[in-house]
């Protein structure tokens, strides 16, 4: 069955179930809680630690992060029992930071940098100095699986948590669709709550972006075994970028069934984002030094440019307890993305004066994805040793279709943009470009010794990779088929109750290359590239706060065309780093969230001798973040908030001759939780880039960069009914 047909079937099922359950939850809801404080806490906070690998972990004191996270096939694990560096940002944090997208949330993580553009149409990231999500195949996981999260941009309306596993995750998640190895970003979807919820949030952002978000949750049935949750939002108006308009519509529904042994859930997402004057990144001509950044408010693209992105996704998941210690689980779902735009591509800066050259185009992209998995999880003991064993099979498929009609060259300037007459271009014919299939089988076992004070996780995955590229005539122009075996070794040692020492060796997998037609060995295929990580760390939990110190090294090989005309695996990037993260309530009423990452990136191997030993593109020496909250003693419910983001200088070419300056962004805000006519209400105000600093940010792996945020005011009001 084609990918689109499978997705359509899942969507129809979701809508039928939603319609059938509508009468049970359409009644007016009672307030989720009578206290104003309830609105400032994560709605799914629980009173005890989670019981199993699929239960939502509880939050750390202060509610900013959870004390556990999803590790793919390993399920949810407590941070102190995890041989990895992982952070899970809660729904409370997403709301209090007034995030709109997942990229907004991850700005606060010292190991992550967003490489998308302010006012752009795609979100992408660097994690531990490696790119994620730069292509047309989305690399965000959804409920622990690839192929479901929206392809180009994920919004936080449907996110209960946003999790970041730092470092390769090929064994736990399978190979990333676009071969990212720096980490895994996972969206934990909002699911029906135990208590009824009716919550509305109204929002405003500079210049005239106005929006509303409705979050409704109900349970029904004799034992409340059925649940439904709806999240819907609309936003629209002028953005903080001059002459740019943006309209967004998001709808998400989650259904579940919680029986004694059987548990089922069904998620459906539909979203559309439209821009007039969407921003695009820049590249720099050779031998030109990076000019000073323009103000982020300046509209650089042509005003007549536009873009429309539509995405639909569905995921069906379930698990059944064969016994108290043996559970079978499965997922099936997929996504469809449709993009069309008439806009700049990637303008090139030609000189120090900021003159640019660009060829606009009419672009269409269609991406179909499907995913399925099935697994078995068992818990047992062999003498004094406990085991948690998981066996899992996965299959992911995607198909990319594309069409482009180019216009004529436009000359402009980043400081004094030139408005040109609108170009009339015909809509392109969309042709199939590529398709791929990623399938694998994995086995893991976590062994517990000495009452779980020592935990050893061992795993192995056999990953099969198959891809095909198509010519304009619709015939296969190249084919790739290969496989790789990737291991996992993780160790956790708890010498004291509040300290965990950990180590991991884990690999990331990337699709092997096919030598290009310009090489003397054209058509030769290469085995999947295996990136290798060694990580050593310590985690300390003291009452209401937690800190993690990690040392890591990741080595990522790749192919290059040599001076002799032979394409081979002769390039390697090695990133070494130290990460320090702090989360939680460091004193009564005072909360911190942030840390610092020190990176030592190096091109250890290269076909170009002059580049060996240079720094990789987009990898700074220092990344630092801090977000603080202070509950004032003079007014109950009133909180001062603020923070800073610092990124050291970054090269935009491998020759290390072109460099972006370091930058710092300061944000500040306030929050007030109270009751209005008996309804819990939270008012928020935030100013991003308080000092309106002008800077370049977001360096992609191919050397593109863009202006940073202008000063932006955000306001919101959340009311529980």
Placement of each model-derived feature along the sequence:
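Structural signature of Gram-negative outer-membrane beta-barrels, strongest in the C-terminal barrel
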Residues: 256, 367, 386-398, 432-556, ...
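Membrane-embedded beta-barrel scaffold of Gram-negative outer-membrane proteins
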Residues: 317-333, 337-345, 501-502, 527-605, ...
């Amino acid at each position: 069955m084609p990918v689109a047909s499978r997705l359509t079937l899942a969507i129809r099922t979701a809508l039928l179930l939603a319609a059938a359950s509508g009468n049970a939850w359409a009644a007016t809801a009672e307030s989720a809680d009578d206290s104003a404080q309830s609105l400032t806490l994560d709605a799914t906070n629980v009173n005890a630690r989670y019981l199993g690998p699929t239960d939502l972990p509880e939050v750390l004191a202060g509610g900013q992060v959870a004390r556990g996270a999803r590790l793919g096939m390993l399920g949810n694990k407590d941070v102190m029992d995890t041989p990895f560096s992982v952070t899970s940002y809660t729904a409370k944090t997403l709301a209090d930071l007034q995030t709109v997208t997942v990229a907004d949330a991850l700005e606060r993580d010292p190991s992550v940098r967003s490489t998308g553009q302010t006012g752009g149409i795609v979100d992408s990231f660097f994690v531990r100095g490696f790119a994620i999500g730069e292509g047309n195949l989305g690399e965000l996981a959804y409920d622990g699986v690839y192929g479901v999260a929206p392809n180009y941009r994920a919004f936080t309306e449907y996110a209960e948590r946003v999790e970041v596993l730092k470092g390769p995750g090929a064994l736990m998640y399978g190979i990333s669709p676009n071969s990212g190895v720096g980490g895994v970003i996972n969206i934990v979807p909002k699911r029906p709550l135990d208590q009824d919820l009716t919550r509305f949030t109204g929002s405003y952002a500079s210049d005239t972006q106005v929006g509303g978000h409705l979050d409704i949750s109900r349970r029904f049935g004799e034992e409340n075994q059925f649940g439904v949750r709806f999240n819907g939002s609309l936003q629209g108006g002028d953005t903080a970028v001059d002459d740019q308009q943006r309209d967004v519509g998001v709808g998400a529904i989650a259904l579940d069934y919680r029986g004694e042994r059987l548990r089922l859930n069904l998620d459906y997402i539909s979203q559309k984002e439209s821009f007039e004057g969407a921003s695009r990144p820049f590249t720099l001509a050779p031998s030109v030094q990076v000019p000073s950044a323009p103000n982020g408010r300046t509209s650089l693209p042509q005003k007549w440019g536009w873009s429309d992105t539509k995405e639909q996704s569905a995921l069906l998941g379930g698990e059944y307890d064969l016994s108290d210690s043996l559970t079978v689980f499965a997922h099936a779902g997929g996504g469809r993305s449709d993009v069309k735009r008439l806009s700049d591509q990637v303008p090139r800066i030609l000189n120090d004066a900021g003159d640019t050259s660009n060829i606009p185009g009419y672009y269409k992209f269609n991406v179909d994805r499907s995913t399925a998995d099935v697994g078995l999880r068992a818990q047992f003991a062999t003498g004094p040793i406990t085991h948690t064993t998981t066996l899992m099979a996965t299959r992911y498929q995607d198909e990319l279709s594309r069409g482009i009609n180019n216009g004529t060259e436009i000359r402009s300037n980043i400081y004094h943009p030139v408005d040109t007459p609108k170009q009339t271009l015909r809509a392109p014919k969309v042709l199939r470009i590529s398709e791929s299939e990623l399938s694998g089988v994995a086995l893991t076992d976590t062994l517990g010794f000495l009452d779980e004070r020592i935990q050893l996780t061992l795993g192995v995955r056999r990953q099969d990779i198959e891809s095909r590229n198509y010519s304009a005539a619709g015939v296969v122009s190249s084919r790739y088929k290969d496989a790789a075996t990737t291991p996992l070794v993780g160790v956790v040692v708890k010498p004291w109750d509040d300290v965990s020492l950990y180590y991991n060796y884990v690999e990331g997998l990337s699709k092997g290359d096919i030598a290009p037609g310009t090489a003397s060995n054209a058509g030769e295929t290469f085995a999947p590239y295996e990136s290798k990580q060694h990580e050593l760390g310590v985690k300390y939990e003291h009452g209401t706060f937690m800190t993690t110190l990690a040392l890591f090294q990741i080595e990522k090989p790749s192919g290059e065309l040599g001076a002799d005309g032979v394409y081979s695996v002769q390039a390697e990037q090695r990133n070494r780093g130290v990460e320090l993260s702090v989360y939680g309530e460091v004193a009564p009423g005072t909360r911190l969230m942030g840390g610092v990452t020190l990176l030592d990136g190096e091109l250890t191997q290269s076909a170009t001798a002059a580049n060996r030993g240079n720094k990789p593109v987009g990898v700074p020496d220092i990344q630092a973040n801090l977000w603080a909250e202070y509950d004032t003693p003079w007014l109950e419910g009133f909180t001062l908030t603020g923070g800073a983001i610092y990124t050291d200088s970054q090269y935009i070419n491998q020759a290390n001759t072109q460099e972006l300056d370091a930058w710092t962004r300061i944000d500040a805000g306030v929050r007030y939780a109270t009751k209005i006519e008996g309804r819990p209400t939270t008012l928020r105000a935030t100013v991003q880039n308080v000092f309106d600093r002008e800077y370049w940010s977001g360096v992609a792996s191919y050397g593109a960069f863009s202006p940073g945020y202008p000063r932006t005011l955000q306001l919101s009001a959340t009311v529980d009914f």
